[in-house]
């Protein structure tokens, strides 16, 4: 009986932790000071966050505005900030900006491209979202020049 109760307690804790992680990603990764940096990857030098996690561009976005909401934002969480984004080493501060999302939050942009994470990238250096065709368009990493890198 003890083993069954322990199993149920562990299963419930694991399920709750999973919901919290998904909910955090679905709302975007919000930071007071949001830093964008660069890192070397198998695709070349790319944009990453302060922890080295890859940032992506969604080809569907037009005019610097995000078109990724709902299920899209659950898989591709936007990089959200509460203030002006900070340029890390190798990032052009003049290319950093923000765009207001439908919920009023500020999403970080680079060279006019709203920036997103991919939920499958959990460690620095992972680029599993590169060249993925989801939600009507392709997803690409960006170079420090703010250009899409079309290698996969």
Predicted features by range, described:
Residues 2-10, 18-152:
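Compact beta-sheet-dominated domain cores in extracellular/mature segments
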